[in-house]
């Protein structure tokens, strides 16, 4: 009897240790939900982004999505409730049905494990939804409806996102990348998460002061790379500013130039517990931004397409990269504008197989893919490519050439075909895909390093392509993310706006203090 009782007691103790932490332990370890929704979507493109374009991670999959969770120290600092992360490569505007579906599924999962001490909200910040302004502001309000205002929300963003007053108010902590290209994307998210855990562990809770300053500047990302001045120095000033006593974090958003809402402009924020330090930090960064506004220029020399091609054909340097920037799918272009490829194939230099070698990456063309797969490698194929989504500048293009490669299984493209037309290797995809790595080319049997000219639908070159180029020009081609912002027909952004309104007066760059969430007077 005595032994039985002891075993029973032991089982009871083990169960208590294993299944539910003591109330003491529960207090020490905050309960945090992980939530994410991200896309950058252009309203100047006829493309739409539907739910099937979003990659999603649910439940425990989310721990492997974030590389920093391999650090068990961070894992052990909280009880985590991963919900749903949805991300799409940039594209066109999101229909309300897709938005409601993604938000609804995420909120349903969020409702399951309440209450929360914290929510980590991972967004891009430049989502556009048909008929809905400021989707991220809407999303965070709906998260608040679920979790209430006792919960701290830490929002992590892309520096090309937009920060409305509503988003700033509902976020207790908020930050964004400090590098473009975004080599610090994971590090920034980790900072947002660690700041949240710190505030919960220390029981300091919501920061007392959040300063928000709208800066009336709207610039394309291709003019604001932090690899070159003036963005390099501007963004380098952020980290030291956050070392001050009473300042938790600060951030500068360039904002998103290819959507037309009042929230599309640059923003500076700082927050912490010392009102003066917070206000001054935000004001200094905002003034710095405004003072260097005239120094922003394109990351590479630019030209019309013909100017770029003339120079590349003339050049002895190879590979000579040309960015087909107006239809860059990673900024929100449809990715199927045929204008550039049409112009390239018209050039006499590329008509013969002995012309300068050129790789064109890439154009979606499901009709050609189907014919090429049927005909096989080495066969002649003729079919239309592109112009299904965005035919405003040129119609679908009939190309006729030899199939050089057929590769199946890419997660974005699904099927990729290389068709040789004259001296041009055209990469045709079933679905649109950005070409950002050397392997993207070599997988298809192409050698970009030994090619005279490589044209990519991209803006600034991502690091791997940048390191490969012998020379580089950015062609100002038409499309949904036209780099020449003055060609865009803005109706709803705030005016005056630099550089659209050249002679505007200096704006008011004093700090506006956003109410602590839930304390709106
Ligand atoms: Zn970005």
Spans of features found by a protein language model:
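Sec-dependent signal peptide recognition
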Residues: 3-10
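C-terminal motif of bacterial Sec signal peptides marking the signal peptidase cleavage site
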Residues: 15-18
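N-terminal glycine-rich anion-binding loop in soluble enzyme alpha/beta folds
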Residues: 26-109, 265
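Hard-cation-handling environments
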Residues: 30-32, 222-423, 427-431
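Active-site histidine-anchored catalytic micro-motif
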Residues: 33, 38-40, 44, 96-100, ...
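Extended hydrophobic packing segments that form well-structured cores
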Residues: 82, 104, 290, 412-521
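Short acidic/histidine-rich motifs immediately flanking catalytic phosphotransfer sites
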Residues: 113-118, 316-318, 451
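Internal, active-site/partner-interface "lid" segment
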Residues: 200-231
